[in-house]
Amino acid sequence: GLDPSTALFTAGIGTLIFHAVTRGKVPIFLGSSFAFIAPIIKATELYGLPGTLSGMVGVALVYFVMSALVKWQGVRVIERLFPPVVIGPVIILIGLSLAGTGVNMAKENWVLALLSLVTAVVVSMKAKGLLKLIPIFCGIIVGYLAAWLFYDLDLSGVRDAAWIGLPQFVFPKFSWEPILFMIPVAIAPVIEHIGDVYVVNTVTGKDFVKDPGLHRTLLGDGLACCFAGLVGGPPVTTYSEVTGAMSLTKITNPQVIRIAAISAILFSVVGKISALLKSIPSAVLGGIMLLLFGTIACAGIGNLVNNCIDLSRTRNIIIVSLTLTV
C-alpha cells in the first residue's frame, strides 16, 4: 500500500503548490482524499502499485479539463456539463460501490469497527467546539486504544522504526487501464472542491471564485494531485474540516495554512509517526470507511434534494435509474 509518510509529504507539498497557483490568497489545506482509498486498493490488486499511481496522475486530468472549461466559459459550464440529475446519482453510486471495501476491512474485527464507527458518529452529533470538527480522528483514536488494551496490537514496527526516515517514494508506470479506472472517481472530489471554495467564501467574506478565480483553485488542486501520483502519494482534496476550524476560530489567514503544510512535510520524515499510522488495525479503518462512504452516498442524495429534482418525471427517473445501474 501507500506509505503514510509519503501521504503527509504530498499533502504538505500539494498545499504549497495550491497556494502558489492561487497567489497565496485562498486559505485551503489539501489532504489525502478518503474517496480514493477503496479504488486505490482495488486498482492495486488489478494493476499493481506503479500502474495505480499512473491512474492517480490521470485524476489530475479531470481538474485540468474543468479548470480550462471554467476559464473559457465561466462557472456555469459546470452546471451545464454536470446537471444535478446526473451528478447526484453518480455520487450515490461512488459511495455505495466503495462501501464493500469498508465492509471487508471491518469484518476482520467487528467490535473494533463498530466501536470506531459509533465514536465518530457520537462525536459528530454531540460534541462541541473543535472536537466536533474531528470525528474521524476521534473514532480512529478510540478504536486504536481499544485494540491496544483488549487485543494483540502489534507495536513492534513502532518500536523498531527510526526516529528520522525519508518517505518511501514510488514512481508510476503509465498505462491507460488504471487511468480510465480512476478518472470517474475524481468527479465527486471535483464537485466537493467547488463546494468547499464557496464555503470558504462565506467564512472569509471574500469571493475566491472571482479572485484568484475558480479555474486557479481547480488547477492548483490538479497539480497537487499530479505531484502526489508522481511520487507515490494518494490524490489530495480540499479539507472541509479545516474550513470548519476557520469558521470556529476566525483564523482565516492563508499564511497559517502554509505553516500547517510545512509542519506536515516535517512530520513526514519522522519514522515513528509513519510506523504508528501503519499499525492502525484494518478493522478500525473499515468502520470509519463505512461512515465516510455512506456520507458520500448521502451527499449525492442531498444533491438531488437541494436542487429539487422531480423524480415523478419520467425523464429524470430514467436518467437516475440508468446512472445507478449501467
Feature roles, as predicted:
Residues 1, 37-46, 100-105, 198-200, ...:
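Generic transmembrane alpha-helix signature in multi-pass membrane proteins
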Residues 1-19, 184-254:
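Membrane-embedded helical hairpins/re-entrant loop segments and their flanking transmembrane helices
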Residues 1-27, 35-46:
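N-terminal signal-anchor module of multipass membrane proteins
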Residues 4-6, 49-50, 84-87, 111, ...:
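Membrane-interfacial loop-to-helix junctions in multi-pass transporters
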Residues 46-156, 261-326:
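Membrane-embedded alpha-helical modules
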